[in-house]
Amino acid sequence: MTMKKIAYFLMTLVAAVTIFSSCSDDETYADQKKRERNAINRYISEKGIKVLKESEFEANGCVTDTAKNEFVYLDDSNVYMQIIRKGCGKKIEKGETATVLCRYEEYNLLTDSLQSTNMIGYYISVVDKMNVQNTSGTFTASFEAGESLMYSLYGSTSVPSGWLVPFTYINVGRPEKEGDEI
């Protein structure tokens, strides 16, 4: 075979592999979204969660009643949120940046399992440290490499967008007097 024929054969082989590998029986994006929505609805039902509309949440002073297991569904971000405590301090104002230490539990609703957490075992001594910035009412943040379990697990300083939603409603600060809650 000449070099030209070998090159042509290899290009044809690569094209064929690409074409046939793109045609698979895997679930479509629509199927994935449906499966995700079903998992969320199942979780809400099994946990007895009362879902508030944003208007109800705002009428209640932007708080949820944890005794009633209330969560608010935020339409714009597709986030279900429960505010356990608003925190002490103040909201992060437009143009400000704050260092925020946080604890979390990440669940995989599709497998009904705890994905990761820094609230038990060895990781209880690790708080995730992130820098949060409010730019004209839009929050962005990044984890500090080496000071975040999320960074260690996923290899990225990007903070999931759902983690930023509560900053519109909560205060950030250190306790200054007895009774202040973080």
Language-model segments: residues:
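Bacterial N-terminal signal peptides that target proteins for export
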Residues: 1-11
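A beta-strand/beta-hairpin structural motif
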Residues: 85-86, 109-182
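C-terminal motif of bacterial Sec signal peptides marking the signal peptidase cleavage site
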Residues: 17-22
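Extracellular/periplasmic catalytic domains that process cell-envelope and extracellular macromolecules
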Residues: 72-75, 93-99, 175-178
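A short beta-strand signature
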Residues: 96-110
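Short consensus segments that form the blades of beta-propeller domains
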Residues: 91-96, 131-133
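Acidic/polar, low-complexity intrinsically disordered N-terminal segments immediately downstream
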Residues: 24-87
